[in-house]
Amino acid sequence: MKDIEDLIQKAVELQSNGLAMGQIADELNVSRETVTWLLTRSKKEEITPAPKDISVNWNNIGKSAKRLHNISLALCDVALENLEKIGAEVDVVVGVAANGIPLASMMAYELGADLAIYHRKGQETVRAGKGTISRNFGSVAGKNCVIVDDVITTGSTSREVIEQLREMGAKPRVVVVLVDKKGVDTIFNVPIQSLLKVVRLD
């Protein structure tokens, strides 16, 4: 997306394809507040101030298996560094649907760990419901878990995953992401490690 008009057009297109607000936010890597602003701005000429947000477009990584693999290796290194500090091993890599899955798949392979997939629920509101761990992949009960996502915007997804894993008897040890837009070090005492931290200066 080169500018704000591209973001508005993409948000309108995604909405017309039936995506919910939360799904549009995930697809564009922006907050729900920003999606609301983009869609509202597309419908009227009234100019309201833009929310303080940053759009992250990583499709040059996502469209290349080689680049995804290289980024996954870097995320593995970050995760292992953190696990060494606490003397823990990784048993399961948990990919957050949808954008965390390709990274988590490659990481699980590289780390010799099981793969689990977390599907969010409640895309329309932040806490509409709990997500689920897919039964078609690895079990998390009693296991050390590395959580993988693409971008942290508000931290709500990471909070949801950590809570759900703990309720299932798992031990979330670290969250690794490409980009942290929130700028947090921990969520529920679980370290957040990113390849990039984005800080907006106003």
UniProtKB/Swiss-Prot annotation:
Pfam families: Pribosyltran (PF00156). Belongs to the purine/pyrimidine phosphoribosyltransferase family. GfcR subfamily. Gene3D superfamilies: 3.40.50.2020. The gene is gfcR2. The keyword Transcription applies. This is Transcriptional regulator GfcR 2. Contains an N-terminal DNA-binding winged helix-turn-helix domain and a C-terminal regulatory domain (or effector binding domain) resembling phosphoribosyltransferase (PRT) domain. It comes from Methanosarcina barkeri (strain Fusaro / DSM 804). GO terms for biological process: pyrimidine nucleobase biosynthetic process; regulation of gene expression; UMP biosynthetic process.
